[in-house]
């Protein structure tokens, strides 16, 4: 569909939160690196997850789909040295996780992608390639990366203010190399929550890594992943949309969430509570955010960049000023998210000023409505849908199908909660 036209209304009801995309990526990778059969259940087949599945299959994993389950056997992973082709689509996780994994043994691999993926930085890996004499060539505009060689253990110095996906990619890979390795983080580490997810998943599959206060990671070589069965928990980055709607006056019960989760995006609860909303735990794995007298705050984007667009919606409708800080990495996501959410919410009647690494948001009582553009970014599209619940007039969102990247059932769930929309 080319656009959705939403008539403003409050959302009410219960919604099963989709499985965590971040955890599904990690479980699929660890299972594919295990010698034996694993069953990964509660999978949502978004475009990003399909990209990782197909990528691991290209590297030799046997993956079968049974409804919402994956049966994965990694007995033949990287057993041959044939030329390998991996289509990452628009998934930065697939690309940055699988690049080092593909080099566990001597290989020739071609990675391609679409959309903004070619513009997302890979300099961290290029520096490693050059240091280890791994051949590579790269076309930026449309991702086309060719690499040839194998990765060796040793010392890896990585900046902490880059995407945590680089560090996770190395954490998956280095335990399988012959020699011991050390990852040294040279600046303050951002997105620690995503590193915690990786370390937790790796440990579940039998691999040990010593974490020295996120300053360095000590990794013994010659380890092996052990197969296991794993159920993917609900995704806090998707729940954040409904939590935000709740903070703005909707009444939504979010099902299948684990309050003890390591997911960094769980921080959305603390941020919304700090602004004046209230968390209700009605039963086990069932959470709601209740509307309160919302006030502006300071939100540090460095540890939870994915939930910043929808938190900007909440801030736009809160009293006083909110500042988004340390958000420069949002400019190199599926789109420039700082610019996109600022531009589109201002079209709806918000008062937002864009800074180099953040936003200044002056709250308004209500938004007006109008025509906006998703920038073909799933999180921008869903954030604008939540904004519509506090608009006075219709909201028209162009290019809404981009939600398939992470949450294919979003528009159906939106309607099931009472959202009034028509497609064109």
UniProtKB/Swiss-Prot annotation:
Disulphide linkage map: none
Protein's GO biological process: amino acid biosynthetic process; aromatic amino acid family biosynthetic process; chorismate biosynthetic process
Enzyme Commission number(s) from the entry: 2.5.1.19
Broad EC category: transferase
Main location: cytoplasm
Localization, UniProt: Cytoplasm
Protein's pathway: Metabolic intermediate biosynthesis; chorismate biosynthesis; chorismate from D-erythrose 4-phosphate and phosphoenolpyruvate: step 6/7
CC per GO annotation: cytoplasm
Recorded catalytic activity of this chain's protein: 3-phosphoshikimate + phosphoenolpyruvate = 5-O-(1-carboxyvinyl)-3-phosphoshikimate + phosphate
Enzyme active site: 306
The protein's role, per its UniProt record: Catalyzes the transfer of the enolpyruvyl moiety of phosphoenolpyruvate (PEP) to the 5-hydroxyl of shikimate-3-phosphate (S3P) to produce enolpyruvyl shikimate-3-phosphate and inorganic phosphate.
Protein name: 3-phosphoshikimate 1-carboxyvinyltransferase
